[in-house]
């Protein structure tokens, strides 16, 4: 009988334009056993997703001030890379006001690290079970 090999720590793409918040989230992600991959803009995030086919979880700040809004990038990620799991956060939006992409989870800021880490672990387990290969 074949057994699947453990995949090791998964990378989590963090899309956050505020340096202090990005560092805080990266630390949280790393402490939870994931590998933080940081993007400061939507353009940088798309470039990373086009080259890093190992990314299965994306953490997005919806309060991005320039260009494409966080909810729009979340929808674009869902359309282009359906297997990717999405965590959305915001200080200025309420969940009821958002049209969330399928399977996306929303957390109001300030986030509770334990809740977000639990969501990441659940998402990682779900992608592991589904065997989520995705094209670049």
Stretch-by-stretch model annotation:
Residues 16, 90:
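Conserved acidic carboxylate
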Residues 61-75:
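Conserved phosphotransfer microenvironments
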Residues 19-37:
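Two-component/phosphorelay signaling modules centered on CheY-like receiver
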Residues 91-95:
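Conserved phosphotransfer active-site motifs of two-component signaling proteins
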């Amino acid at each position: 009988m074949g057994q699947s090999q453990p995949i090791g720590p998964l990378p989590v793409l963090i899309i956050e334009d505020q340096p202090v918040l990005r560092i805080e989230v990266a630390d949280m992600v790393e402490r939870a056993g994931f590998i933080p991959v940081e993007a400061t803009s939507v353009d940088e995030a798309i470039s990373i997703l086009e080259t890093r086919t190992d990314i299965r979880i994306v953490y997005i700040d919806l309060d991005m001030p320039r260009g494409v809004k966080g909810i729009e990038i979340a929808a674009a990620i869902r359309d282009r890379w359906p297997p990717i799991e999405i965590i959305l956060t915001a200080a200025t939006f309420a969940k009821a006001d958002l049209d969330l992409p399928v399977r996306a989870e929303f957390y109001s800021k300030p986030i509770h690290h334990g809740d977000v880490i639990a969501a990441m672990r659940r998402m990682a387990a779900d992608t592991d079970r589904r065997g989520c290969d995705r094209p670049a």
